[in-house]
Design a protein with these regions (language model features):
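C-terminal catalytic/substrate-binding lobe primarily of soluble NAD(P)-dependent oxidoreductases
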Residues: 3, 149-417
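N-terminal Rossmann NAD(P)H-binding glycine-rich loop of SDR-like oxidoreductase domains
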Residues: 8-22
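Short, conserved SAM-binding/catalytic segment
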Residues: 45-53
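ADP-ribose/adenylate-binding Rossmann-like module
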Residues: 83, 94-112
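Rossmann-fold NAD(P)-binding glycine/threonine-rich loop
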Residues: 106-127
Length: 417
């Protein structure tokens, strides 16, 4: 087949950088073309990769001619620039026009729905487009497919994610996404059909791995309840719940997110505030007013005590970074041999000393790299259309892909009860 040219757009972003580094571990016959609006940020990454393997160049993805020239002849185009609600459209359109395969780790509902609307166009163009190929969505979708395969009938699917203390490594696109997840409309699947809830309102407790234990999580606006019904149309309920660790972060993000939703705080100013907090700066007064409102609500709902909040604020004020605990879990219920059965999968470890879940950038980047390996292993022309992970990435092939990009097998998942 010869050397395959792999194009990364938005390559300087933290998650995309991790995807590139982990993908290089698989050691195929690939030429890595790294593009970003600020290519100088890629110099160290290029030096860390095998000599001659990668090149870096400037690209404004909204420059149609420049984008077309960058992706011409690529075996795969990976979009790592967010927020996807603004970036996915032009890149997907360019890939369709050029006839080259596309892959992203989109976690926004609106851009996911737009991508799915392009399915017939992708079929007509003979182009595979793989969306939502990160940790959540992505890894979670594969875990669902794996668990559901043990059942004769799928009735309910619950997806859970919790992200630990990520200070110092969160970009503005991630903060934008987090604010949209924490407040606003939430598309989900209930009683056999799509419904609209309010994000973060409904809560539940679940037992998570990676040192998290029994954790309160909140219903969130995420792509899984939008895409999984395509594979499991007869399921009664498909829900996604998420949260942050330690719990006070939930109050901060929820309080600021509500202010954005109500129009009392501009999104840019809200992101500025959270970005300041994530880099151990004070932020703005308006942000703190809304954040404190969210923190007080945690006490009212029982998610945290006043003592816990005081301790959290005191430690955070002096720049203390809390032990990183990040985890994913899926729980699928239905019938097996005529009997009600629950099948679960969850990630077992996270934090320093781990590979897959060192932090969320590592989890998303490593999962993306594994999906890339699986996609590139397929013969050209195998499929065409827009696909979410549960539709094309067979679980065992994906797990082997994770191993090929360096993940120890015992970090991938365990079976929870």
């Amino acid at each position: 087949m010869g050397t395959q040219r792999i194009v990364f757009i938005g390559a300087a972003g933290e998650m995309c950088r991790l995807a590139i580094e982990r993908f290089a571990v698989a050691d195929g016959d690939w030429e890595l073309a790294l593009y970003d609006i600020r290519p100088e940020l890629l110099e160290q990454l290029v030096r860390r990769l095998p000599p001659g393997r990668a090149s870096a160049a400037r690209l404004d993805l909204y420059d149609r001619e420049g984008l077309r020239a960058a992706i011409e002849g690529a075996a795969l185009v990976v979009l790592g620039a967010g927020p996807y609600i603004r970036t996915a459209g032009p890149v997907m359109a360019a890939c369709l026009e050029a006839g080259v395969p596309y892959l992203d780790f989109d976690d926004d509902i609106e851009s996911t729905l737009h991508a799915l609307s392009l399915h017939e166009d992708a079929v007509a163009a003979g182009v595979p487009m793989y969306i939502g190929c990160g940790a959540s969505p992505g890894f979670t979708n594969v875990l669902v497919a794996d668990a559901a395969a043990e059942l004769d009938r799928v009735d309910n699917i619950d997806v859970y994610w919790v992200v630990g203390d990520e200070r110092g490594s969160i970009g503005r696109a991630v903060l934008d996404h987090m604010l949209r997840v924490a407040a606003g409309p939430c598309m989900t699947w209930e009683n056999g059909g799509p419904v609209l809830h309010q994000s973060w309102v409904e809560t539940r407790w679940t037992e998570l791995g990676a040192g998290l234990g029994l954790t309160m999580v909140h219903e969130t606006a995420h792509p899984e309840p939008v895409t999984l019904p395509r594979k499991y149309p007869d399921a009664k309920n498909i829900r996604c719940f998420g949260g942050l660790d330690p719990a006070p972060y939930n109050g901060i993000v929820r309080g600021v997110g509500l202010a954005v939703q109500k129009g009392t705080m501009p999104m840019v100013k809200a992101i500025d505030f959270l970005e300041a907090l994530m880099t151990n700066k004070f932020g703005n007064v308006q942000g703190w007013r809304n954040a404190l409102s969210g923190l007080r609500n945690l006490v009212r709902t029982g998610e945290a005590t006043r003592t816990e909040l005081i301790k959290f604020v005191a430690l955070a004020a002096v720049g203390h970074t809390f032990p990183h605990k990040t985890g994913l879990k899926v729980e699928v219920t239905g019938l097996r041999n005529g009997l009600p059965t629950t099948v679960s999968r969850r990630t077992p470890v996270s934090g320093p000393g781990t590979y897959l879940f060192t932090d969320m950038a590592a989890a998303t980047g490593t999962a993306c790299a594994a999906f890339m390996v699986v996609a590139l292993d397929e013969q050209p022309g195998t499929r065409a259309g827009v696909f979410t992970p549960e539709e094309w990435a067979e679980p065992e092939r994906f797990y082997k892909g994770l191993e090929r990009v360096g993940t120890p097998r015992d970090e991938i998942f365990d079976v929870s009860h």
